[in-house]
A protein has these predicted regions:
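Beta-lactam-recognizing serine transpeptidase/beta-lactamase-like catalytic domain environment
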Residues: 1-40, 45-176
């Protein structure tokens, strides 16, 4: 097992070499270096983007039908896998219940300027990127240890609003 005493004062070279080849990566800082999709934690960003651009208000209600059919791959709300939908839901309730369907529709509205234009990935993504940047999610945290750069999604706004698509962040970047 890992013993930091063997690395204090003088370094046991053989031990250090074994740590570097250990498949469990005991020297790898997962909190700052491993990037992953943020998932539902990103829904706060999507809420801010939707509210500030006016595609939703605090009282806007969206009917969760389980399967989102406005785009071709028809993503599903997680609740449907448990035999129900969230029904008519507003942004506060959608955050509380982590309703994917609601945020799919926010992404769609961002990509269509609230249904006034045809669907355009670039339009939706640029708005998501703008608000993620305003919230500091386009930069590292500044802690004084090695940290991977964050990646804001650059495709699929409907999926990006639930923290999927190609969003990628280190845990520390989401925790600030």
């Amino acid at each position: 097992g890992y013993d930091n005493n063997r690395l204090a004062n003088t370094v046991d070279a053989d031990y250090f070499a074994s740590l570097n080849t250990d498949l469990s990566k005991p020297l790898y800082n997962y909190a700052t270096q491993e990037r992953t999709a943020p998932g539902s934690t990103f829904k706060m960003v999507s809420s801010v983007a939707g509210l500030d651009t006016g595609v939703i208000t605090l009282t806007t209600q969206i009917m969760d039908k389980g399967v989102y059919e406005n785009i071709s791959n028809h993503p599903r709300c997680w609740a449907l896998n448990h035999g129900y939908t969230h029904g008519l839901i507003n942004v506060s309730e959608a955050l509380r219940d982590s309703c994917n369907y609601f945020f799919y529709d926010v992404g769609y509205r961002l990509a269509t300027n609230n249904f006034s234009t045809s669907y355009d990935d670039a339009t939706g993504i640029s708005k998501i990127q703008e608000y993620a940047s305003l919230l500091g999610l386009d930069e590292t945290t500044g802690v004084e240890i090695e940290e991977n750069d964050p990646q804001i999604a650059d495709e699929y706004p409907v999926m990006a609003t639930i923290g999927q698509s190609n969003n990628n962040y280190a845990t520390i970047q989401l925790g600030r």
